[in-house]
Design a protein with these regions (language model features):
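Solvent-exposed loop/turn segments connecting transmembrane beta-strands
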Residues: 142, 173-176, 445-450
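Extracellular/periplasmic, surface-exposed regions of secreted and cell-surface proteins
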Residues: 181, 187-196, 201-206, 215, ...
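Solvent-exposed loop segments that connect transmembrane elements
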Residues: 218-220, 225-227, 331-341, 520-531, ...
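C-terminal extracellular loops and terminal segments
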Residues: 593-597, 639-658, 718-728, 760-776, ...
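A beta-strand signature from Gram-negative outer-membrane beta-barrel systems
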Residues: 1-37, 145-147, 160, 166-168
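Conserved small-residue
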Residues: 37-123, 214, 498-499, 505, ...
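Outer-membrane beta-barrel transmembrane strand signature
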Residues: 94, 98-153, 158-166, 242-300, ...
Length: 885
């Protein structure tokens, strides 16, 4: 695999190279006898990143919950200590469950704020027994993974072949999230004539993915999200229904455990927080299965013409047929109220690429010349249809025909086309001086006719300084090559930016220049068409102008080698959307928002510490320093800035710039303080009216407990939150058949909004809900015994305690150990006697560990914020054997 990042290389690939190009070279047969390779590995999969550091002791949770109620009554309502004590204990019932047996006439929490020592964990109402379960331990498991690969290859003077077969089975880290994949590939080349070579590279993949719904960033706070619930549910709730003696009850029909959904149906208790929720129950009784059949075919014919010319025709076909079966059982959970639900969906994706190339290559003494001209067309079509029904007749039958009422159906067809003409030429003199030029004209169906075509240029220069006579005597230097390039690439694929904000249409970006309407009607009669997505016929190509200047070097007989690069990229006509007033009939419109610049330095250093016949030891280190800023905003934005939600886009500042109130800690009563502005008062009511201004017309700042004041009048910019530096460090070691490798990565100097932590620090306001867990940092909150804390007091009436502010900016620095591998290859002298070329045993750990600012927070998941709702990185420990003969 080769990553192309320089301006000339990426420009040649047009819009699909706008974010860099990854070249994957598939295996081909090597001349000689047939070679067979077999590789098998087995392993265990678990979570790399644990949950946040939450309260896990039921009594400790009740003490904090009591404190929230007590402080609310005592400080805000003005009740006496005795009255507040009584009311707070009564409010503990808002959790909906009783899991402690408390002596008659006594309270669960005493006047000292501690759990009643006479209370015993476990409670029965005569029908069921209630005791908390460890939801995290029950939800996440260490599971099995196995993978097998077999390849056969060979070649002669006119024919080469490579075929492979692989199978992967992975059970996932949560129940019902397993993955099976079966793949076959064949790569064949045949020299049909002295002047003609033809080839075929085909692959077929079949996958079955059990992918439970609502386990990603699009289902934050979902009652079915196992990650969110395991992170956030209080440690006081049963996961299972138990009989009066404490034994877990089982469903007679399926033999599965009966799960407590907290809805008052299975038992007499109902949760206040996330009622009708039990993700493990959903994962047990419900099912979402994705079946995919993927075909990839690439064919070519290459003709060697006269005088250094070659002509090549390439055809590529990718098809993806997927079927989704979504089954929500009729007995338990949210679908039980309407007898269960089934959804079947089938999607067919077809991508066709055709390419025609004319290449010229020749040498005239020390002058080397090459040129390439070509045309490329690309067509993508996606068709899908779905059906949905309720009232399931048979359990565990996932087909739509098993539903008996409330049928709905729909379908869509979407197409996207591009075409491109391109030319590139290169010249070098004696492999010393290099010149590259190129041009590409791309067209797309994503824009209106008058904006569909874009022109993109590139050029590059190179100088192999080691070839100069005045460096020949510098024996320590093996290579020193300077290079610089400028290239333009276009981007029309704003599907992500637009579609993810346009509702439920994943293809909105393909038609962003058009107004899209949704038809409505009943019983076959059309009634109306409503605007679904507002288009913009003035949209045009997003264009990136990239400049690179760098050097490749090698010293000491290639023991020390690497590269150093400076890059500058300016992306103009950036494709995005603009929020508008709903009075227009729509909330957003796609636009070319302006110009964004990215610049920085990146380097790579490799050093062979030991390099001889028996032992090799090398280290590698790479890093990138980068900066981002908005150079110019579209005239659609007034005053050179645009505010949307908690983000601000402003000329001269980073595109990753938050706009939030500044948190100042707490006041003398433990209330959250923010930097707001001084307000004029109504003389009659005493209520705030308008901000007070100084002589220059600026607001006068002051600390306030009124979050709305700070949010409306005095939000502050965060500045660039992106990491300043990121990179990796690794080492490899080999000695007499033994090999060892370790690879790590890091990032420094950035910030991220820790939404997962914020959720767990909620101790008041509308977000405060009995049954929602707390982070252990809540134990450090302000109290009369801890007045130095900057964490607001636990108080259910403090509605501003965890509002959006810079309080929850957290360092996004991390260091991760990504991979450790240890292997041993048996000596060839031992294997040759039994006809084996190579035999290697190995073990590896992937995603070993990550060290970040807070337990449970993984800064790799996003550039802007992290949540407790996402399917986290997985650690895989495996061992295997690789055999070649």
């Amino acid at each position: 695999m080769t990553v192309l990042k320089d301006a000339v290389s990426t420009s040649l690939y047009g819009s699909r190279g706008s974010n860099g190009v990854v070249m994957i070279t598939t295996k081909k047969g090597q001349q000689g006898r047939t070679q067979i390779t077999a590789d098998a590995k087995w392993g265990a999969v678990s979570r790399e990143v644990a949950n946040y550091d939450v309260i896990k002791n039921p009594g400790e949770y009740y003490e904090q919950l009591y404190k929230g109620y007590y402080n609310g009554y005592r400080y805000n309502s003005g009740f006496s200590a005795t009255k507040s004590f009584q009311l707070a204990n009564n409010d503990l019932s808002k959790t909906g469950y009783q899991i402690y047996t408390v002596p008659t006439g006594q309270y669960l929490v005493g006047k000292n704020g501690k759990l009643n020592p006479q209370a015993t964990l476990g409670y029965t109402d005569g029908t069921n027994y209630f005791t908390p379960d460890a939801w995290e331990d029950a939800t996440f498991k260490t599971t099995f993974r196995q993978e097998y690969n077999v390849g056969i290859s060979g070649a002669s003077d006119v024919f080469s072949y490579y075929s492979s077969f692989s199978y992967l089975q992975d059970d996932g880290t949560i129940k019902g999230s397993g993955f099976d994949r079966l793949t076959g590939r064949t790569n064949v080349e045949y020299k049909a004539k002295k002047w003609l070579t033809i080839g075929s590279n085909m692959a077929y993949t079949h996958t079955v993915s059990n992918s439970p719904l609502e386990q990603d960033e699009n289902s934050t706070n979902s009652s079915s999200n196992a990650f969110f619930i395991a992170n956030n549910i209080a440690p006081i709730y049963p996961m299972y229904v138990r009989d009066a003696t404490g034994n877990i009850m089982y469903d007679k029909a399926s033999g599965n455990k009966i799960y407590d959904y907290g809805d008052g149906e299975s038992t007499g208790f109902a949760r206040n927080w996330m009622s009708m929720s039990n993700p493990l129950g959903d994962l047990t009784y419900n099912k979402t299965e994705y079946n995919m059949d993927i075909f990839e075919g690439n064919w070519f014919a290459k003709a060697d013409l006269t005088h250094g010319f070659t002509a090549t025709v390439r055809l590529g076909l990718n098809t993806d047929n997927s079927i989704i079966y979504n089954y929500n059982n009729p007995l338990y959970g949210q679908s039980s109220s309407y007898g269960g639900e089934i959804m079947n969906e089938q999607t067919r994706t077809t991508a066709l690429t055709h390419q025609y190339l004319l290449n010229y290559q020749n040498a005239f003494g020390k002058h080397n010349v090459s040129a390439l001209a070509g045309f490329e067309g690309y067509r993508l079509k996606v068709t899908d249809f779905y059906g949905n029904g309720q009232q399931i007749y048979r359990m565990n039958d996932y087909m739509l025909g098993n539903s008996t009422s409330k049928f709905t159906a729909g379908g869509t067809k979407n197409e996207y086309h591009t075409a491109g003409y391109f030319f590139s030429g290169s010249y070098n003199y004696d492999e010393t001086y290099f010149v590259n030029i190129g041009y590409r004209r791309d067209g797309t169906s994503a824009f209106a006719k008058n904006n569909r075509w874009g022109n993109f240029f590139n050029f590059g220069l190179g100088w192999n300084m080691k070839k100069e006579s005045w460096l020949q005597d510098f024996e320590a230097l093996d290579q020193l090559k300077l290079r610089t390039s400028f290239g333009q690439t276009g981007n029309d694929n704003h599907n992500y930016n637009l579609a993810t904000t346009a509702g439920d249409d994943p293809y909105a970006g393909w038609y962003a220049y058009q107004d899209i309407f949704k038809m409505t009607g009943t019983d076959g009669v059309f009634s109306d068409g409503t605007l679904k997505n507002k288009g913009n016929a003035d949209l045009k190509w997003e264009k990136t102008n990239a400049f690179d200047f760098g050097a490749d070097y090698s010293f000491f007989k290639s023991r020390l080698y690497g590269s150093l690069d400076f890059f500058f990229r300016a992306t103009s006509n950036l494709l995005d959307f603009k929020q508008v007033a709903l009075i227009n009939g729509y909330s957003k419109i796609p636009i070319n928002m302006g110009t964004v610049q990215n610049y920085g330095v990146e380097f790579e250093i490799n050093y062979d510490i030991i390099k001889n016949h028996d032992m090799q030891w090398s280290v590698n280190f790479n890093g990138t320093w980068t900066k981002n800023r908005i150079h110019k905003l579209s005239s659609d934005y007034e005053n050179g800035q645009y505010i949307t939600g908690n983000r601000i886009y402003k000329e001269g500042e980073s595109i990753y710039n938050f706009y939030l109130p500044k948190y100042l800690g707490v006041n003398e009563n433990g209330e959250a303080l923010y930097l707001g502005v001084k307000m004029n008062k109504d003389p009659e009511t005493g209520k705030d009216t308008t901000p007070v201004k100084d002589e220059e017309g600026n607001y006068i700042e002051e600390a306030t407990t009124d979050y709305d004041n700070a949010y409306e009048y005095n939000r502050k910019e965060s500045g660039d939150i992106l990491p300043k530096v990121y990179g990796g460090l690794g080492t490899t070691f080999a000695w007499k058949g033994l090999d060892f490798a370790i690879q790590t990565s890091f990032q420094l100097g950035g910030r991220i909004y820790d939404q997962g932590y914020s959720d767990l620090m909620t101790t008041g306001g509308t977000s405060f809900s009995a049954g929602h867990n707390f982070h252990k940092d809540v134990l450090k909150a302000w109290s009369e015994d801890n007045t130095s804390s900057n964490i607001p007091r636990v108080d259910f009436t403090d509605k501003y305690a965890t509002s959006f502010s810079d309080r929850f900016y957290t360092s996004s620095d991390y260091f991760s150990i990504d991979n450790i591998t240890l292997g041993y290859t048996l000596p060839k002298s031992l294997l040759s006697r039994i006809g084996i070329q190579s035999l290697r045993f190995y073990g590896s750990i992937e995603n070993v560990a990550i060290f970040s600012a807070r337990k449970g927070m993984d800064p790799r998941m996003s550039l802007t914020y992290v949540s407790s709702s996402w399917y986290t990185a997985r650690r895989t420990i495996s061992g295997g054997i690789k055999l070649t003969f």
